[in-house]
């Protein structure tokens, strides 16, 4: 990450999470541990990265990661290379975010649910003595918008085909027409989301929809 920060002249941001998709683990030959183990790994990893990014030397003795007076040279270009934590688990992920994150990104949540999770993060910040304003708050939303009513109908078919009944509680998607997408942007803004990250899943992509998004929805983000 430090090398990328230098290549980009101080624009790198590091994003991590506890992991959730077993096929991704299997594809690279890693075992897929239980949720507790993955949350333990995330907490230790976040602490290790925070130390490496911000301290001359890093020392951590954990179950999964150990650093002994480890340097990170050259130092990042940024005074503080941003560490983002993604996820919405209230007991562990949000607690880890409150401890170490410069930014928190929640995946595929509707505005009301995102607001509730954001309030949980605030409570963890208060309990741990962290300034809530030190953590940027964003939401990851799926893109299933059409440029017009016909395009929206096609996008809805794709949404149902890709997610169907197995949505894992996810409800945060840009669906329908640009007008409806703009309304959703306003709803997220109203509950405190600072940015929206647009998730484009497997193609082929609807370029008319993307152009309509750029022309009609992006202005609502600024």
Label the model's feature ranges.
Residues 1-222:
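Active-site-adjacent structural elements that line small-molecule/cofactor binding pockets in enzymes
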């Amino acid at each position: 990450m430090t090398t990328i920060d230098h290549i980009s002249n101080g624009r790198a941001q590091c994003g991590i999470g506890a992991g959730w998709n077993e096929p991704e683990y299997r594809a690279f030959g890693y075992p897929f541990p239980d949720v507790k183990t993955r949350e333990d790994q995330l907490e230790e990893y976040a602490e290790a990265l925070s130390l490496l990014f911000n301290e001359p030397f890093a020392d951590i003795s954990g179950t999964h990661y150990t650093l002994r007076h480890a340097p990170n040279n050259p130092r990042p270009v940024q005074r503080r290379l941003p560490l983002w934590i993604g996820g919405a688990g209230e007991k562990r992920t949000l607690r880890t975010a409150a401890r170490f994150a410069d930014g928190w990104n929640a995946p595929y949540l509707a505005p009301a649910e995102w607001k509730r999770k954001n309030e949980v993060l605030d409570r963890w910040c208060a309990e741990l003595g962290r300034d809530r304003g030190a953590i940027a708050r964003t939401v990851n939303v799926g893109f299933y918008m059409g440029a017009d009513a016909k395009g929206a109908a096609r996008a809805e078919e794709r949404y149902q085909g890709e997610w169907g009944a197995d949505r894992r509680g996810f409800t945060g998607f840009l669906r329908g027409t640009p007008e409806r997408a703009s309304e959703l942007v306003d709803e997220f803004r109203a509950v405190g989301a600072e940015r929206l990250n647009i998730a484009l899943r497997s193609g082929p992509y609807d370029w008319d929809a993307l152009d309509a998004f750029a022309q009609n929805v992006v202005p609502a983000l600024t």
